[in-house]
Regions:
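Active-site-adjacent structural elements that line small-molecule/cofactor binding pockets in enzymes
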Residues: 1-155
């Protein structure tokens, strides 16, 4: 799921997967891990800002959901859940993103200029995921924008 962090993936998700696989006599070689993929990038500062706003709102939406509280807890951010949940019930969707600070954004998303996205993904997840799912908001940059990023990641 996109609502994860490197810390949660390494400390919770992967150990649970490994334990489940071991119970069934399998190993991680028998399983494909698809990494969380919030990405904040864009061709210019304005596009990056739009992308950050969109991803902050998406993080806030997920953080308001009780099912994802564990992801917040591992970082000590569980107190935010109640505020976001109450705001969601009041329909304050746009304002919810304002509660997601830079530290949280950086934990949940790869925030990088286009030519650095692949390197950042590799640094965070290269040793523990087999594939990445990109979840980017803030503008449709099209295939011409994403093709070099994907090619760099595949290289």
């Amino acid at each position: 799921h996109a609502f994860s962090t490197e810390t949660y993936l390494r400390e919770v998700t992967l150990p649970r997967i490994e334990a489940g696989l071991a119970k069934s006599g399998r190993t991680m070689d028998d399983f494909e891990i698809i990494g969380p993929g919030f990405v904040v990038t864009g061709p210019d500062e304005e596009a990056m800002a739009r992308a950050a706003t969109g991803i902050r709102q998406q993080i806030a939406f997920y953080a308001s959901t009780p099912a994802y509280l564990g992801v917040l807890e591992i970082h000590g951010w569980e107190g935010l859940h109640g505020d976001l949940n109450a705001m969601s019930k009041r329909g304050e969707w746009q304002a919810m993103g304002d509660l997601i600070d830079d530290e949280m954004l950086d934990a949940f998303a790869v925030v990088a200029e286009p030519d650095k996205v692949a390197a950042e993904i590799r640094a965070r997840y290269g040793d523990c995921v087999d594939r990445m799912m990109f979840y980017a908001l803030g503008g449709d940059h099209g295939a011409d924008f994403w093709t070099p990023i994907v090619a760099d990641l595949a290289a």
